């Protein structure tokens, strides 16, 4: 009689399917992995074991769903294999750029058994193994070290983040489509705004519009993770506040935040709006924030330092005694990221980031101030555009208008 312990620990599971149409060309994915392997050779790293959503997706075109299971992408000079859980069956192979191996649930250490098997097949039994210190847990690190005792674990997270910060033409095309779809979501949000409508209904209407357009534009893609934060009144105080059942009221400050997700890539549209009317103090604060936004758009160009952009914009807020009302940095890089993975922290418009803007980078301008509840003009004010930096300057790929001339919504 067959026992659970008799079942195989790993398997190659294609399930009779074929590879799906990839997000990017073979040439693009080869370029990314060639650059990775060149870095590995230069740094004396024999193999890399990626564990994060963003790096596995960036180098393999497969975005996993963890549900407390482990996933990996193992890369050597000769092997490129995603390691996925049996619960996903053949989907990871269909979506992976290269090979895939499945580990089963039947023994607790099957994940590392599969990783070790791939490494051994790639000629690695000892040496320097690249890992992501900013993602790998202490428990997993200990388990890897126990499974590979003659291995030195070397952090590669910062180096590969530097690779991801520069976008290829294919990536920029996808990001431009994302910005276009975010604008569609924004228009749908405005369409749904009415006094008495709850926040979540507005968010749902915009999300549906974006998902449908992603499906139309990328019929081969998984449809996942697209969302909207739509906030009203006091709920606008935090940029990352989720929709609630609060019903919109006349005179409300509103915050529209649309995030279409395409194959793990993030784009965004964020706008301040008012319902029907705006008080004098609200209008004054809104116009100040728009002034900062406009100046920020002018400052983003090749050769500018992130910290210098932040410093100049701080002066505008300081002139109006609003510097202390800022809530976060002025912008960040775009690419493979979401609210639960990614973030290219080396490319953010903050006072402590010395990075110089270069062609191939894609960044946002998104100033925000928050006035506490109970004070005149209370609420959160935020505008957000996406800019592509090239040899010739910058291109603003966000088309949705901002400011009082456009976004006092009258129904």
UniProtKB/Swiss-Prot annotation:
Signal peptide positions on this chain: none
Gene Ontology terms, MF aspect: creatinase activity
Class in the EC hierarchy, top level: hydrolase
EC number: 3.5.3.3
One Pfam family of this chain: Creatinase_N
PANTHER family: AMINOPEPTIDASE, XAA-PRO AMINOPEPTIDASE P-RELATED
Protein name stated in the entry: Creatinase
């Amino acid at each position: 009689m067959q026992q659970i312990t008799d079942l195989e620990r790993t398997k190659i599971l294609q399930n009779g399917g074929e590879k799906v149409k990839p997000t990017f060309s073979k040439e693009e994915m080869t370029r990314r992995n060639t650059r990775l392997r060149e870095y590995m050779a230069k740094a004396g790293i024999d193999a890399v074991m990626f564990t994060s959503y963003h790096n596995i997706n960036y180098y393999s075109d497969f975005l996993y769903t963890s549900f407390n299971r482990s996933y990996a992408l193992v890369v050597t000079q000769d092997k490129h294999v995603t390691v996925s859980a049996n619960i996903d069956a053949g989907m990871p192979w269909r979506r992976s750029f290269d090979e895939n191996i499945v580990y089963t649930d039947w023994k607790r250490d099957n994940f590392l058994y599969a990783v070790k098997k791939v490494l051994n097949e790639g000629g690695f039994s000892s040496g320097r193994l690249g890992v992501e210190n900013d993602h790998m847990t202490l428990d997993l690190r200990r388990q890897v070290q126990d499974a590979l005792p003659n291995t030195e674990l070397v952090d590669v997270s910062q180096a590969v983040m530097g690779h991801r910060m520069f976008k290829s033409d294919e990536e920029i095309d996808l990001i431009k489509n994302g910005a276009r779809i975010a604008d569609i979501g924004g228009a749908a949000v405005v369409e749904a705004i009415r006094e008495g409508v709850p926040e979540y209904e507005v968010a749902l209407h915009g999300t549906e519009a974006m998902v449908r357009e992603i499906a139309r534009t990328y019929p081969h893609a998984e449809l996942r993770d697209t969302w909207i934060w739509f906030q009203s009144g006091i709920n606008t105080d935090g940029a990352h506040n989720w929709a609630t059942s609060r019903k919109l009221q006349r005179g409300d400050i509103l915050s529209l935040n649309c995030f279409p997700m395409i194959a793990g890539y993030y784009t965004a549209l964020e706008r301040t709006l008012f319902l029907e009317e705006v008080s004098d103090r609200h209008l004054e604060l809104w116009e100040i924030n728009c002034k900062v936004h406009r100046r920020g758009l002018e400052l983003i160009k090749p050769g500018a330092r992130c910290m210098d952009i932040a410093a100049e914009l701080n002066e505008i807020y300081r002139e109006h005694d609003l510097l202390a009302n800022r809530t976060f940095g002025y912008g960040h890089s775009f690419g493979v990221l979401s609210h639960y993975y990614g973030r290219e922290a080396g490319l953010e418009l903050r006072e402590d980031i010395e990075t110089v803007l270069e062609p191939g980078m894609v960044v946002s301008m998104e100033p925000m101030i928050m006035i506490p509840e109970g004070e005149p003009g209370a609420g959160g004010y935020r505008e957000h555009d996406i800019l592509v930096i090239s040899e010739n300057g910058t291109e603003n790929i966000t088309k949705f208008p901002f400011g009082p001339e456009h976004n006092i919504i009258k129904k």
